[in-house]
Amino acid sequence: DVLSNAAAVIAEGEVMQLAAMRNADISEDNYLRIIEAKTAALFAAAAEVGGILAGASETEIEALKSYGKNLGIAFQLVDDALDYGSVNRVLGKNTGEDFREGKVTLPVVLSYRRGDQTGRAFWERAMSAQIDGSNDYEADFEMAVQYLQTTGALQDTVARATHFGERAKDALALFPPSDMRTLLIQLSEFCIA
């Protein structure tokens, strides 16, 4: 039941993401709803199933589900930020993949919302151009990184990831100290490091 519900939510999230494709003018709340329905739902289901299989109480299962949800959001936000940086090569993701595919991520949403008319026009054109191929990808990507840095969008995305990583760790507070709790905390810290 947990996994089938998660699969339905993930499918809904995929549809929401496809509907937001090319549209940098979505709210941060709408973007967070998309990643809650995609990445966070998967992480939450995995953590919930782990609790069920371990025979945890309902309260403990809810705490694990909250841990997974917040960890999933943190993970996705870090992934969003890494798309515009060089560290991601270590993680096996090529820089600019999301940008090349026209995926609107939180850094783009924040930069668009904070940008002036020129910045917003850039994001509208660049996101559409990534889909239809009518662009100079390298020049657009360099400009995108500049806009993200100028508006503080990357730093704020990482700050939000850290916030959700901390919320994930906080969800584990009801569990007594143990090796498993320590490992889950370390996983959250690794995600946002």
Predicted regions: what they are:
Residues 1-193:
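All-alpha prenyltransferase/terpene-synthase fold signal
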